[in-house]
Amino acid sequence: MRLLTLIFVALIALLQYPLWLGKGSWLRVWDLNQKIVAQKAVNAELKLRNDTLDAEVRDLKQGNAAIEERARSELGMIKQDEVFYQVIDQMPGQPASPPAALTGAQ
């Protein structure tokens, strides 16, 4: 009887080996599931970026408003007969100088 129990334990151990450590083991399945979750997150980020770029391309193809906006903001272009005003912020630590009309200088 003792020999039969030992044989059954050895047989169960041999049957359990592929389940836990073999090619299609639970550990490998768990690892692959973790990789799938991570890849789905990356794919979602890339899809969002692609959708944004696609919308931008469609906008640029449809009208001149997007092209004009880009030319103004990124290239600093202005339309003909427009006047460009540039406001320069004061450097920190410098006192504000009064306008020339207030100081008496003309």
From Swiss-Prot:
InterPro entries according to UniProt: Cell_div_FtsB (IPR023081), FtsL/DivIC (IPR007060)
Any one GO BP annotation for this protein: FtsZ-dependent cytokinesis
Membrane topology: Single-pass type II membrane protein
Cytoplasmic topology ranges: 1-3
Periplasmic side: 22-106
Subcellular location: Cell inner membrane
Coiled-coil region: 31-73
Keywords for this protein: Cell cycle, Cell division, Cell inner membrane, Cell membrane, Coiled coil, Membrane, Transmembrane, Transmembrane helix
Residues passing through the membrane, by range: 4-21
Main subcellular localisation: membrane
GO cellular component: cell division site; cell septum; plasma membrane
Function: Essential cell division protein. May link together the upstream cell division proteins, which are predominantly cytoplasmic, with the downstream cell division proteins, which are predominantly periplasmic.
Complexes and interactors: Part of a complex composed of FtsB, FtsL and FtsQ.
Family that this chain belongs to: Belongs to the FtsB family.
Protein name in the entry: Cell division protein FtsB
Native source species: Methylobacillus flagellatus (strain ATCC 51484 / DSM 6875 / VKM B-1610 / KT)
